[in-house]
């Protein structure tokens, strides 16, 4: 079973749109040092749909090299593409590089019928020996999983479901069905939202965008949850929900870059067409103050880097 705090980590590019290997590796290392357990690579946050297959494999390699410096850290690459052939290729490359599992969003842009989606996952599952997770993200894929389709995919060997929309009726049915019927099938929530209630129904892993810029908060929340300190876990959950909402003023990838800059870390650039606001934008200072306040509320040390985007 995959457990812990996972990050859908951003991929950092340079001014000319090339992969910035040094900054991307630094960011992975920094998150691991602050308690993140695993990396969900080249997903929506990580600009996977904006990258070539070779670039995505290079990110997997960078992640492997960073993870190998730590104990107990793991890689869960996202391999979903608009076409089946590329998704299968990326799954095979991820397996070669030591990933514990792969996740795949359904083929996007075109609207596909259930039988097409099932065949897509069948080919990925049959191509590798490591677990394959489907990624339910209707906002980006134009496809919404049904309980019936999940059941069919389970028979083909699907290992689990990463779910982002958190339709309570759907996700509780999938999770409890697996528990009651002793299915080897895991639900991972694709957001920090809902962590506490879903933990109490058996969910043990979440993929949280906040880990990109405030992994300390997520680490503390999960630590208190696992320790049974319900009062502190609830307090951390409320703080997490508040500061997360404050960062949802723009695309999550852009917000993650901005939040890192607000903490004084050089986060390079997102890939175009995504654009960062100029550093003169007062939003950077507002973000810094919001994150600092969240840390102070939880008694966490607020560390900053040396990149002077804003005045302290």
Question: PLM features: what roles do these ranges have?
Answer:
Residues 6-11, 34-35, 210, 214-312:
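C-terminal alpha-helical cap/extension of soluble enzyme domains
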Residues 2, 36, 41-44, 78, ...:
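Short glycine/serine/threonine-biased micro-segments
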Residues 23-27, 55, 59, 86, ...:
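General structural feature for long, well-ordered alpha-helical segments within catalytic domains
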Residues 1-7, 11-142, 306:
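Active-site beta->alpha loop and helix N-cap motifs at the rims of alpha/beta catalytic domains
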Residues 126, 138-250:
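Catalytic alpha/beta core domains of metabolic enzymes, predominantly
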């Amino acid at each position: 079973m995959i457990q812990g705090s996972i990050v859908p980590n951003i991929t950092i590019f340079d001014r000319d749109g090339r992969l910035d290997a040094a900054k991307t590796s630094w960011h992975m290392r920094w998150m691991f040092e602050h308690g993140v357990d695993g990396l969900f690579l080249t997903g929506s946050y990580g600009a996977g749909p904006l990258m070539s297959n070779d670039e995505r494999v290079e990110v997997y390699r960078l992640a492997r090299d960073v993870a190998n410096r730590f104990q107990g850290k793991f890689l869960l690459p996202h391999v979903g593409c608009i076409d089946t052939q590329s998704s299968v290729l990326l799954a095979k490359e991820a397996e070669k590089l030591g990933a514990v599992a792969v996740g795949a969003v359904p083929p996007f842009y075109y609207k596909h019928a259930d039988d097409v989606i099932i065949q897509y996952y069948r080919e990925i599952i049959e191509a590798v020996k490591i677990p394959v997770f489907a990624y339910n993200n209707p906002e980006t894929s134009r496809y919404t999983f049904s309980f019936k389709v999940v059941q069919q995919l389970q028979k083909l060997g699907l290992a689990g479901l990463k779910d982002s929309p958190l339709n309570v009726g759907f996700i509780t049915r999938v999770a409890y069905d697996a528990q009651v019927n002793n299915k080897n099938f895991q639900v991972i929530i694709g957001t920090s939202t809902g962590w506490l209630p879903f933990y109490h129904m058996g969910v043990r892993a979440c993929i949280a965008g906040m880990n990109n810029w405030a992994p300390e908060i997520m680490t503390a929340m999960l630590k208190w949850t696992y320790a049974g300190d319900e009062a502190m876990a609830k307090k951390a959950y409320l703080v997490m929900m508040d500061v997360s909402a404050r960062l949802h003023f723009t695309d999550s990838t852009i917000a993650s870059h901005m939040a890192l800059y607000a903490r004084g870390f050089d986060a390079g650039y997102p890939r175009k067409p995504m654009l960062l606001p100029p550093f003169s934008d007062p939003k950077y200072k507002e973000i810094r103050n919001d994150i600092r306040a969240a840390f102070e509320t939880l008694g966490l040390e607020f560390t900053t880097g040396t990149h002077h985007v804003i005045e302290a």
